[in-house]
Amino acid sequence: LLNILSNYDKNYTGVISIDRKKMNKVDYLDMPVAYAMDQPSFFNELTIYENLLLIASSRKIKKQEAFDKIERILDGLGLKKYENYSPSELSKGTMQRLNNACAMIQEEKITIFDEPFSGLDPVQMKLLENVIVEFHKKEKGIYIISSHDIECLQNVCDKCLLLHNGQIREINTEEVDREKIAKILSEGE
């Protein structure tokens, strides 16, 4: 589903529209969707800062605005001390934070995070939660987060959807817990 929403997978039936534009007719670079995939890819010959600046430039974000936003993201995610590192020099958790930063810099209407908390320690998870909440308030976009970390989802989401066997079900965020989800999955409730 995430690949379809982000236009990576065009092999589906039905129609996905954003602002009345059919997404299967939109060029990938013109998609109003940013996607932090579960398998990140970076330009290892560039620094972290340069990777973020390149993405901002490709999305036509004004230079000073990009500089300011990169600083906020680096500070918020605890990446400031790594800004001159190559992505190849980073730990898995730090690469995951960079992957999330790459999606957040894009300023799209929809930002998709696929397992954004994977590989993060509890401190890094809390940093990411705070940045997601802050950016969501400021940017006013839609954030779609796919995660198995129920506690983190409760901390950042105002709606939770459960996708199971091709069916989507909305669950009240305050009521989301492992037992309820396990019951829904096992009984097909």
Which positions does each model-derived feature cover?
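Helix-to-loop junction immediately C-terminal to a conserved catalytic motif
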Residues: 6
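Conserved ABC transporter NBD signature motif
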Residues: 14-29
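Conserved ABC ATPase "signature" region
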Residues: 53, 57, 65-82
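Conserved ABC ATPase signature
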Residues: 86-90
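Catalytic Walker B motif of ABC-type/P-loop ATPase nucleotide-binding domains
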Residues: 111-114
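H-loop/switch region of ABC-family ATPase nucleotide-binding domains
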Residues: 146-148
